[in-house]
Amino acid sequence: METASDRRQAQAEQVDLGGLTPTYLITKRCFDFTASLIGLVLLSGVFLVLAILIKLDDPHGKVFYSQTRLGKDGRSFQMWKFRSMVAGADKMVDKLLKKNDVEGAMFKIKNDPRITRVGRVIRKYSLDELPQLYNVLRGDMSLVGPRPPLPREVIKYTNYDRQRLTVVPGVTGLWQISGRNDLDFPEMVALDIHYINNACVLEDIKILLKTVLVVVRPTGAY
């Protein structure tokens, strides 16, 4: 039986991949590779400082944290972050699901008890995402695109939601510069589809520049 939600999704913007020309995709990949390589080199000192702070704050866990995410066409890969939570945080998820602050197939808690002191700071300024430059270098991710979801989230996806998996996921995107965690899941999906349908080099550059401003003046990050 069709629900009101199904009808809203059917009437919403649908993905059109016609604008993703070979020229755009090749240019995007070349830029991603070059920018991520330069970023990893220039930010090596920042990586070292963050690694030391993470270890001093919580010496029992690792500096880096990898998590299985789903990329283009649902292909899985290991996404890297600086660890911002206590060791064994993944095992605590089931107990915290009822406290989810985000509507839809996504899990976020504003006052997540698993986050460490250093973790709270690096998450606020998105510094925990810096290791994803390695994912960009490998081609798992792009600098700009929809955020890669967890497998457990995709299980709950509708056919409409799955449209966000038709492109390479990104480190940043319209969601991050439009309110981030202040937006609910349906709004995030709508923004992702809008990005895919209007993707171009100029739009990617605009999103990257706005991301810098969001990092400097963080809102909706937790």
Question: What residue ranges belong to the model's regions?
Answer:
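A hydrophobic, helix-centered structural microdomain
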Residues: 19-90, 201, 207-222
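Short, glycine-rich, amphipathic interfacial segments at transmembrane boundaries or analogous
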Residues: 2-8, 64-113, 172-190
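Positions in alpha-helical segments
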Residues: 36, 51, 65, 116-120, ...
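A short, structured surface patch at a secondary-structure boundary
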Residues: 102-167, 208-215
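Acidic active-site catalytic centers that drive phospho-/nucleotidyl reactions
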Residues: 32, 128-135, 192, 204
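C-terminal terminal-structure detector
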Residues: 2, 18-23, 110, 160-222
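Flexible, Lys/Arg-rich cytosolic regulatory linkers and terminal tails that connect or flank
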Residues: 1-27
